[in-house]
């Protein structure tokens, strides 16, 4: 019927507006087919669709949840904040309006002051942080807290816990006042499995950071582009053969 989906994956959801309208004008999708299997959610969505078709302006059912989520930012409308976050953070820009509203309900808003510790090295946490406003310092040397990498607006951090399931590899401190979005691992995994553009942004950033950390700490990011574009992230199980004695190869491998 011409409905577009977010990816070619069998589990991909249809692209929908915040009013559940598909890419086919006038065709709406609610409930399990839209990624919401609970009957109560489907009923709320159906009500919104009927009111929309009737020409009545009503707030989305999730509006109170998002208003509560953004309570620390008084005087700013939900839609304006959602738009600002997606515009400022490339990782989050590939979601549809409906996907992003659900994503933000699962996430937590943090407002940090300069000097606040966001998380510490070796913590057993695996959420991902996105920087909507402000800057943070990543302390990459446990022996010298002044050896840092600065991350600016639009960046994200904490992805190694997501990709490799490891403890935090660095301490991160707010350099100035920050507006951060913290997203749990489950929501991030759902994002990268259903939105190919987000997975590409995440993988590319992870490769850049691993190369800069382990191979080329003093080389500008732009000079590494050709190397990063040719690199891939591979997952191996116990017992899988990585290389064999006598292999002829010009590859470099980084264990993350």
Describe the residue ranges of each PLM region.
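Short, glycine/charged-enriched secondary-structure capping and boundary segments
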Residues: 1-3, 43-44, 196-197
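FAD-site-proximal beta/loop scaffold in flavoenzymes
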Residues: 1-37
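Gly/Ser/Thr-rich helix-start
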Residues: 3, 27, 32, 36, ...
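Short secondary-structure boundary/hinge segments and terminal tails
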Residues: 15-16, 46, 191
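Short secondary-structure transition/capping segments
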Residues: 18-20, 41, 193
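Conserved mid-domain beta->alpha element of the FAD-binding
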Residues: 37-51
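Cytosolic regulatory regions built on CNB/CRP/Popeye-like sensor folds
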Residues: 50-256
């Amino acid at each position: 019927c011409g409905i577009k989906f977010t990816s070619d994956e069998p589990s991909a959801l249809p692209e929908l507006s915040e009013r559940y309208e598909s890419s086919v004008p006038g065709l709406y999708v609610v409930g399990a087919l839209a990624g919401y299997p609970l009957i109560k959610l489907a009923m709320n969505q159906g009500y919104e669709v009927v009111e929309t078709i009737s020409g009545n302006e009503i707030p989305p059912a999730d509006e109170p949840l998002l208003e509560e989520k953004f309570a620390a930012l008084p005087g700013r409308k939900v839609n304006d904040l959602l738009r600002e976050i997606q515009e400022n953070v490339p990782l989050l820009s590939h979601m549809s309006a409906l996907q992003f509203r659900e994503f933000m309900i699962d996430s937590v808003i943090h407002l940090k002051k300069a000097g606040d510790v966001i998380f510490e090295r070796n913590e057993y946490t695996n959420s991902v942080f996105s920087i909507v406003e402000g800057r943070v310092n990543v302390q990459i040397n446990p022996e010298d807290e002044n050896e840092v990498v600065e991350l600016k607006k639009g960046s994200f951090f904490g992805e190694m816990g997501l990709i490799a399931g490891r403890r935090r590899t660095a301490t991160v401190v707010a350099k100035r006042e920050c507006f951060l979005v913290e997203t749990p691992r489950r929501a991030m995994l759902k994002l990268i499995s259903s939105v190919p553009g987000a997975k590409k942004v995440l993988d590319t950033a992870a490769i850049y950071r691993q190369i800069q950390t382990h191979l080329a700490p003093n080389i500008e990011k732009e000079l590494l582009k050709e190397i990063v574009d040719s690199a891939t992230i591979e997952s191996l199980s116990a017992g899988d053969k990585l290389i064999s004695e006598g292999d002829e190869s010009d590859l470099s491998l980084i264990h993350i």
